[in-house]
Amino acid sequence: MGSEVLKLLRDKKPLIHHITNVVTVNDCANVTLAIGALPVMAYAPEEVEEMVKNANALVLNIGTLSVEEVNTMIKAGKTANQHGVPVILDPVGAGATSLRTKSAKRIIEEVRVSVIKGNSAEISTLSGRTGKIRGVEAVEEEEDISDIAYDLAVKCGCVVAVSGKVDVITDGKKIAYVKNGHPMMGTITGTGCMLTSVVASFCAVAEDYFDGTLEAFVAFGIAGEKAAQNPKVEGPGSFKVAFFDEIYNLSPGVLASERKIDLIVKG
């Protein structure tokens, strides 16, 4: 499955329209290129409808948001819905401030989101519970996050993916636990945002958004493991360079052989 989707991604080179934050925009563009897709960053409300019509996936990331930008995201999201373009929402910092929480919930209410990807605190907040967050980072993982994510997936009718020590992905029917990854990935800012770009890249070509999201998490985690094993890596700076190289050099064979996942099918 993963081999097929990665090959398809690199053959088709899907266009990924980002409305994302100013902190990580360059990294998101570069990781999209590295995995094999094409990034475009278009924010102007006057052009987002036209741009998203030509895209194969849309990323909505509220990391550095304003009310005006949220309005633009919703405008783009509704157009994506009309044209069958998957919408990937990264509710960065939901739970940290009322603006972020209300904005994320508003997007979910007004746009048919395909995938919600966040940390445990963000996903808990969107489910109506209280997540422990500091700034935009979860400071403590929820013990029952798989149940919380499952319930949110059922409620919203979409895939919910939670990044953490063990990643959790569910569509309300199946739950996958991904154990690929490395602690070094948490030493650089933007890995979560970059993961969202990779999720969008896979979902742009996958027939099923659960499968696309799962393969993206596996690919991202394997790249992190391999980068951390590079003898030239001495800290966050060299790790980041090695990580981009590993994303670029991922092969279908490695993706198939080095995955660490547990899959549960709900009754």
From Swiss-Prot:
Alphabetical list of InterPro entries matching this protein: Hyethyz_kinase, Ribokinase-like
EC numbers for this chain: 2.7.1.50
Top-level taxonomic group: Bacteria
Positions that bind substrate: 41, 190
Entry keyword set: ATP-binding, Kinase, Magnesium, Metal-binding, Nucleotide-binding, Thiamine biosynthesis, Transferase
Cofactors: Mg(2+)
Pathway: Cofactor biosynthesis; thiamine diphosphate biosynthesis; 4-methyl-5-(2-phosphoethyl)-thiazole from 5-(2-hydroxyethyl)-4-methylthiazole: step 1/1
GO molecular function, one term: hydroxyethylthiazole kinase activity
Reaction equation(s) it catalyzes: 5-(2-hydroxyethyl)-4-methylthiazole + ATP = 4-methyl-5-(2-phosphooxyethyl)-thiazole + ADP + H(+)
Leader peptide range in chain numbering: none
Residues given in the record as ATP binding sites: 117, 163
Enzyme type, top EC level: transferase
Biological processes, Gene Ontology terms: thiamine biosynthetic process; thiamine diphosphate biosynthetic process
Disulfide bonds: none
Family: Belongs to the Thz kinase family.
Function: Catalyzes the phosphorylation of the hydroxyl group of 4-methyl-5-beta-hydroxyethylthiazole (THZ).
NCBIfam families: PRK09355.1 (NF006830), thiM (TIGR00694)
The protein, known as: Hydroxyethylthiazole kinase
Organism in which the protein naturally occurs: Caldanaerobacter subterraneus subsp. tengcongensis (strain DSM 15242 / JCM 11007 / NBRC 100824 / MB4)
This protein's encoding gene: thiM
